[in-house]
Amino acid sequence: MKRIPSLDGLRAISIAMVMVGHLGKWKHISVGPLDSYGSLGVQVFFVLSGFLITKLLLQEHDRSSTISLGNFYARRAFRIFPAAFVFLAVVAVLFWREMHWTHIAAAVFYVANMDETKPWIFNHLWSLSIEEQFYLVWPFALKKWHRHKTKILIAVFLGTPVFRALLYAVKSHGPIGGSLPVYSDQLAIGCLLAVFAKRLPRIPGYLGAGMAIAAVLLPWYPATSPVRSLFMLFVLRPLLNVCIAGVVLHVIQVPYRALNWAPVAWLGQISYSLYLWQELFCSNANLHYGFVLIVPSIACACLSYYFVERPMLRLREKLARKAQPSGPVLKAASQPA
């Protein structure tokens, strides 16, 4: 799959929102719900992930009338595991006093979203765990029920807010509150976008801008009462998903120069490694250093990207060429959020 213009730019914006969300808790710049933009950035990553993975799987199904789960999981393993396991190894050594083997196991097996006692350095791994669980479920479901994919995705998109609101109503704050079903609508709308992208009309610039503005403003909604919180969970969050999907579709249809500017695209390319390493520096424990923490975060991300991610992607392509000498090689553009 060729690199899609503007998506690296969206990744750059997303990782910037995550870091602003963390650093927004710094006492000298605490303005409004800046920390909510961390969640918004992750939400964009989920939509992008659903879109890209589904697009990749549908292209394979169109070519061969099937989906090779083995090949899919091998590609994901080369893309995701090396950088993540290097990060885990480093922080396990640095913070061994705060670690228990169960925390390491939860991170390695991508169930950190269910680990309520994990140390602060693993707090961000909840979203990567949800994505990995999505990778385990969705390709299998798409292969088995390909003809019913649209019905399945619509049911998930509409059912998730109901499930989320019910959890809030019964005050369930245990491990299930961070589980895949709670966030499935964000992934589902990205999948739906991949299914219908070619058939959807071009989104006018004013509508694309309006959805982008709405996505930025919705986190400011004051969920200050139970009724307001239910309204946010049941209505506003699905609306935010629609706005994000609309923005993704718009920038694919009309590539923006700013999103494809080399420094912005580069930040998007290293966004996975940057997401892994920013937690080490941009946590509550280090907030008194402020925005200077961005520098070591990017430095570690660069080391991870150039010395771990890219070599493993080149190895993946080399092995793919040996396995299928005459077939197309998947590029790193199919990378997850």
Show the residue positions of the predicted features:
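Functionally critical transmembrane alpha-helices in membrane proteins and complexes, commonly lining
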Residues: 3-59, 78-84, 111-115, 128-130, ...
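Interfacial loop-to-helix transition and helix-capping segments at the boundaries
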Residues: 5, 30-42, 101, 118-130, ...
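Aromatic-anchored segments of alpha-helical transmembrane domains
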Residues: 16-24, 92-93, 111-115, 156-167, ...
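Alpha-helical transmembrane segments of multi-pass integral membrane proteins
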Residues: 39, 187, 191-192, 208-312
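Transmembrane alpha-helical segments and their boundary/interface "anchor" motifs
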Residues: 39-42, 46-48, 58-92, 106, ...
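Membrane-interface helix-loop-helix regions
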Residues: 67, 74, 81-132, 159-178, ...
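Membrane-proximal cytoplasmic C-terminal regulatory module of class A 7TM GPCRs
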Residues: 69, 262, 290, 311-337
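Solvent-exposed interhelical
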Residues: 132-159, 167-168, 194-210
